[in-house]
């Protein structure tokens, strides 16, 4: 007997239809951005004021939200959620592969010094970088799940409120949803990881979540004309017309 929690055939068909419709590079770039931001998050940026905690992951974190905004604009909120959670599953698979690789015996090429000797401390540090910590993986996964749902919902609500279809509206819905969702993402991670494991205060968590979200939002602002242009190309080429007719326009 099928469990009540199992996806219905219609939901599975919806997921399959969108993944068939979605340009392959969108999902590939989304997955790549998740992998890259998690690896780069291991490098904290120095020379910053005490109220700003930022890691190198911000160079890629905006990409995922920009792709969701583009997808929601063209294919709808449900499609944005499917894109996000599919990418999250692939990311977890890659995290597992990285963890397995860290357990393999051997030395990283970067652990060798000028004399050709492998330095155990550096080799162990590289293994740990790719292996990650269970609480960091858990926290980042919960954070991106929550912030993705939040981003896509806010994006749609802002679009309904503005009622127009131009770059100004696209930028507004993207900037508002991304700014708030990045804050939610950062704060969720801080509540799960930074406060209990690194001893942050709640004030530190909120302040750094807000300032970090601003830095990440600025990256999307810079590239928003490009993402808007891509959406317009999709519309001109009627990309996903059959999907829209079946799942969006029919509602």
State the predicted function of each range:
Residues 41, 45, 94-98, 151-155, ...:
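Alpha-helical transmembrane segments and their lipid-water interface positions
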Residues 80-86, 167-175:
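Membrane-interface alpha-helices at helix entry/exit sites of multi-pass transporters
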Residues 87, 123-144, 173-177:
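Alpha-helical membrane-spanning segments of integral membrane proteins, especially the hydrophobic core
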Residues 101-135:
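Membrane-interface interhelical connector segments
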Residues 91-115, 144, 148-152:
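Transmembrane alpha-helix/helix-exit interface in multi-pass inner-membrane proteins
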Residues 98, 102, 106, 189-198, ...:
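Juxtamembrane/transmembrane-helix interface segments of polytopic membrane transporters
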Residues 2-88, 92-93:
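Hydrophobic transmembrane alpha-helices
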Residues 11, 167-172, 183-190, 202-251:
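Alpha-helical transmembrane segments and their cytosolic interface
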């Amino acid at each position: 007997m099928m469990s009540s929690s199992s996806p219905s055939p219609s939901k599975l068909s919806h997921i399959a239809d969108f993944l068939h419709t979605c340009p392959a590079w969108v999902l590939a770039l989304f997955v790549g951005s998740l992998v890259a931001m998690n690896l780069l998050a291991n490098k904290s940026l120095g020379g910053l004021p005490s109220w700003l905690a930022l890691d190198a992951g911000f160079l890629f974190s905006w990409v995922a939200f920009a792709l969701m905004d583009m997808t929601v604009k063209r294919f709808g909120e449900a499609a944005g959620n499917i894109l996000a959670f599919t990418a999250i599953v692939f990311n977890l698979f890659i995290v597992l592969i990285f963890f397995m690789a860290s357990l393999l015996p051997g030395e990283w090429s970067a652990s060798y010094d000028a004399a050709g000797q492998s330095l155990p401390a550096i080799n162990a540090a590289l293994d740990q970088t790719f292996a990650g910590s269970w609480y960091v993986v858990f926290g980042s996964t919960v954070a991106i799940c929550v912030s993705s749902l939040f981003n896509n919902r806010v994006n749609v609500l802002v679009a309904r409120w503005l009622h127009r279809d131009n770059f100004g509206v696209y930028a507004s819905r993207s900037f508002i949803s991304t700014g708030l969702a990045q804050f939610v993402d950062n704060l969720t991670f801080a509540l799960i990881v930074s406060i209990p494991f690194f001893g942050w205060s709640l004030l530190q968590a909120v302040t750094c979540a807000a300032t970090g979200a601003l830095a990440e939002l600025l990256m999307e602002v810079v590239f928003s004309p490009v993402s808007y242009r891509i959406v317009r190309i999709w519309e001109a080429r009627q990309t996903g017309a059959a999907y829209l007719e079946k799942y969006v326009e029919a509602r």
